[in-house]
Amino acid sequence: MKKLISILGSTGTIGLNSTIIIDKNKNYFQPYIFIANKNFKKICSQIRKFKPIFFIINDQKTYQKISKKFKKSKTKILSDLDLIKSKKKCDITISALP
């Protein structure tokens, strides 16, 4: 069974290195929650490539652009961490926030 993995700060150096490991081990990991601030290009790329169940974007302007762009995506684009508190627990969390 795949492990649910969350990355807090997915577009930074540690987050990007973590996604490389996920990409090389697709049979072991299911991207669950990715969190980023405002790097539009990297966020778009990660949604397309990894298809996390949730993607939380802290910056409001970026959130609005991304949510419009990916409104038909299976990834749920959110702007508030509180919206996922009631969701199931993930197996692995990588905190890559400064």
Tell me what each language-model feature is.
Residues 8, 34, 58, 78-80, ...:
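Structural motif
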Residues 11-13, 19, 62, 75, ...:
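Residue-identity detector for threonine
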Residues 67-98:
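A structured beta-alpha segment of the ubiquitous adenosine-cofactor-binding alpha/beta core
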Residues 32-39, 43-72, 76:
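Glycine-rich nucleotide/cofactor/substrate-binding loop typically near the N-terminus or early
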Residues 1-51:
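N-terminal Rossmann-like dinucleotide-binding module
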